[in-house]
Each structure stands twice: as structure tokens, then as C-alpha cells.
Regions:
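Ferredoxin-like alpha/beta domains used as RNA- or RNAP-binding modules
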Residues: 1-13, 20-21, 30-64
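Short N-terminal binding/cap micro-motifs at the start of the first secondary-structure element
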Residues: 25-27
Length: 64
């Protein structure tokens, strides 16, 4: 039986992602954390590690 991967398994801390939707479309971010529903991402300019952006994982694409 295959286990469902959790959000933190699919997007580990440090994962580079590109925003696919929203006003930040095509911007690059680093995943800083995740919970059951959202990724928390930072770019070091507007969104820092201490104040990350909350992002729907359906609107994020893995880069590496």
C-alpha cells in the first residue's frame, strides 16, 4: 500500500519554487516551512524568513 506524501515531503525546507498563480506569478521563492494546507515561502526582499508569504501548494512549481 502506497502512503500519501505529506506537503513537507513534497516540498522540503529549502526547496526552490516558482509561483504559478497570483500577482507574484513567475517569481522565485525558497520554502521555509509548511503545514497541512500551505507552504511558507521567502524571497529575501519583500518576504523574509521571519515574515514568509503563505502560498497554496497548487500555485507553486518545484524548480530543482
Amino acid at each position: 500500500m502506497m502512503k500519501n506524501k505529506t506537503l513537507s515531503d513534497r516540498y522540503p525546507k529549502g526547496q526552490l519554487v516558482r509561483s504559478r498563480q497570483g500577482r507574484d506569478q513567475n517569481k522565485l521563492y525558497i520554502v521555509t516551512a509548511s503545514d497541512d494546507q500551505f507552504l511558507y515561502v521567502a524571497n529575501g526582499v519583500k518576504w523574509t524568513v521571519s515574515n514568509p508569504k503563505r502560498k497554496n501548494p497548487l500555485h507553486a512549481q518545484k524548480i530543482n
